[in-house]
């Protein structure tokens, strides 16, 4: 079944979720793969929100929250949420002045370039993923005990991500991608592996994975990589594990998309 949704529209996201909920479909895997890049000029969605912020984070936050009933439908089945972040999240910031509700339709001086904004949005993916997994483990949320949430860097892949950039930048990046990026056909390997690999599933959620080990299918590497505390995964940006940043992003995003906190 194919259901259309436009992440530049909160109404479209809500309609998409409504259709799935009405069909009583159980979702075993949710891969949040949508993303865009823009130029430095201000571009607003129909909701009056800066477009990149909405597509790359807010609509994915809204969709995930709305679909939780389909993910927690039965206690004897596990579900996995995979947030497609990026290694660029390491240079991102959770800037509370730039991303609060009063700065959604104006270019704030803290939002310097489109690349900084993109990096910020990819950090939000990692922060939200960890926040979500932490929520699933809290007392009283046993109905979500079978769900885990992880974030990943898919690698440098041939794609249309650059189409929102100024034409000269798009040409440059397309050329670079054609020379050194992974073929599009391989672009989903990291996402699918993170969602289905038995040994990764056994480690639960709240993790961040880079593409290198996953792409090489190296099981031993997956189980002894950089994050020695967990024994698996890669250590993400500090904000991804900061409860303070997690709570701020959750509360702010909930208010913007019109959802109450649990």
Regions found by a protein language model. Give the residues of each.
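Rossmann-fold NAD(P)H-dependent dehydrogenase/reductase core
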Residues: 1-163, 259-260
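Intrinsic disorder
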Residues: 7, 11, 43, 181, ...
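Short coil/turn segments at secondary-structure junctions
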Residues: 47, 51, 111-112, 116, ...
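Alpha-helical membrane-targeting segments
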Residues: 108-115, 156-158, 162-186, 221-222
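A generic structural signal for secondary-structure junctions
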Residues: 166-170, 199, 258
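C-terminal helical subdomain
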Residues: 174-234, 243-247, 251, 255
């Amino acid at each position: 079944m194919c259901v259309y949704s436009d992440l530049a529209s909160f109404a479209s996201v809500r309609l998409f979720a409504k259709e799935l909920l009405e069909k009583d479909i159980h979702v075993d895997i949710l891969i949040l793969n949508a993303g865009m890049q823009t130029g430095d000029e201000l571009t607003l969605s129909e909701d009056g929100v800066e477009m990149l912020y909405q597509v790359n984070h807010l609509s994915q936050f809204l969709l995930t929250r709305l679909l939780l009933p389909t993910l927690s439908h039965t206690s004897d089945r596990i579900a996995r949420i995979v947030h497609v972040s990026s290694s660029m999240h390491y240079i991102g910031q959770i800037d509370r002045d730039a991303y609060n509700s009063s700065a959604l339709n104006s270019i704030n001086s803290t939002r310097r370039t489109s690349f900084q904004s993109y990096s910020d949005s990819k950090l939000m993916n990692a922060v939200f993923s960890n926040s979500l997994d932490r929520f699933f483990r809290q007392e009283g949320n046993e109905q979500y005990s079978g769900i885990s949430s992880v974030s990943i860097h898919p690698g440098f892949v041939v794609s249309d991500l650059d189409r929102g950039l100024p034409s000269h930048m798009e040409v440059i990046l397309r050329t670079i991608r054609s020379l050194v990026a992974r073929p599009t056909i391989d672009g989903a390997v990291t996402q699918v592996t993170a969602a289905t690999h038995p040994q990764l599933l056994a480690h639960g959620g709240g993790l961040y994975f880079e593409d290198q080990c996953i792409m090489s299918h190296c099981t031993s590497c997956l189980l002894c990589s950089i994050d020695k505390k967990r024994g698996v995964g890669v250590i993400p940006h500090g904000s991804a594990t900061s409860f303070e940043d997690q709570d701020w992003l959750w509360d702010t995003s909930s208010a913007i998309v019109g959802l109450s906190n649990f």
